[in-house]
């Protein structure tokens, strides 16, 4: 994908910060124009001309409050106080404040920085395990996208950066996995907008990638015997079951 092509799918919308009440612009994707190409085994959506994950964070440029879109307005009074004390009091607004007028795509580095600020905010406000896990998962996905972008350049001088990105991808992936395990045990469904079977499949796929075959097998089996799981998630679970069996026989 090129920056010029990606920019065609973006626009700025006005958002009101629930912490400092400032109004600012944030970059979002024109979802009606985006075509789904495919999904990775762990549900990351692929689009041909834009990495939509880069634009799923809202960050107030005036006070520093930052969160994924789905969690941005979901704050208790106590959490607002924690954010003001733990984030806003230390935040230094950029001189330009709002988004630049020209709509340009975020680099992976900028998108990752925004997500890391969202994760820090989630820690400060004592957010749910699922919010922290989902944020970590998306950071991991961004590193995956950045690795693919860097590898496509086929430059020897990028080898060290690719290795660093891969280490970060794995670290945040493990953190996301552990967070979702906690969320399944302590939260009610839906979790992050996903029903029980979708979450179970996601965690099973993550467990498979991390080598936790016992967890992956248990969750896949629960999906396959469920009377309420849909055909799509059952098909995915069956494919994952075949991969698990193949892996165990290596």
What are these model-derived regions, one by one?
Residues 1-85:
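N-terminal cysteine/histidine-rich coordination modules
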Residues 86-119, 123-161, 193-209:
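Amphipathic alpha-helical repeat scaffolds of TPR domains
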Residues 115, 122, 166, 173, ...:
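Inward-facing hydrophobic residues that define packing positions of alpha-helical scaffold repeats
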Residues 122, 143, 173, 179-183, ...:
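Alpha-helical junction/boundary sensor with strong preference for TPR arrays
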Residues 131, 168, 172, 188-196, ...:
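Structural signature of alpha-solenoid helical repeat junctions
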């Amino acid at each position: 994908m090129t920056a010029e092509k990606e920019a065609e799918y973006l626009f700025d919308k006005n958002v009101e910060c629930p912490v400092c009440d400032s109004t600012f612009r944030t970059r979002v994707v024109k979802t009606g124009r985006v075509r789904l190409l495919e999904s990775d085994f762990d549900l990351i959506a692929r689009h041909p001309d834009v990495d939509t994950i880069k634009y799923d964070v809202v960050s107030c440029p005036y006070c520093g409050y930052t969160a994924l879109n789905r969690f941005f307005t979901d704050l208790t009074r106590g959490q607002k106080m924690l954010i003001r004390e733990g984030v806003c009091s230390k935040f230094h607004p950029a001189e330009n404040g709002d988004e630049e007028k020209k709509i340009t795509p975020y680099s992976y580095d900028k998108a990752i920085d925004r997500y890391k600020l969202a994760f820090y905010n989630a820690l400060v406000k004592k957010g749910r395990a699922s919010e922290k896990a989902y944020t970590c998962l998306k950071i991991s996905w961004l590193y995956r996208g950045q690795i693919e972008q860097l590898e496509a350049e086929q430059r020897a001088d990028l080898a060290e950066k690719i290795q660093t990105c891969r280490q970060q991808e794995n670290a945040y992936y493990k953190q996301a996995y552990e967070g979702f395990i906690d969320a399944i045990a302590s939260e009610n469904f839906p979790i992050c907008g996903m029903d029980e079977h979708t979450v179970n499949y996601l965690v099973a796929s993550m467990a498979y990638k991390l080598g936790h075959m016992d967890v992956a097998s248990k969750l896949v089996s629960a999906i396959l015997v469920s009377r309420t799981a849909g055909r799509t998630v059952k098909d995915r679970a069956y494919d994952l079951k075949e991969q698990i069996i193949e892996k165990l026989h290596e």
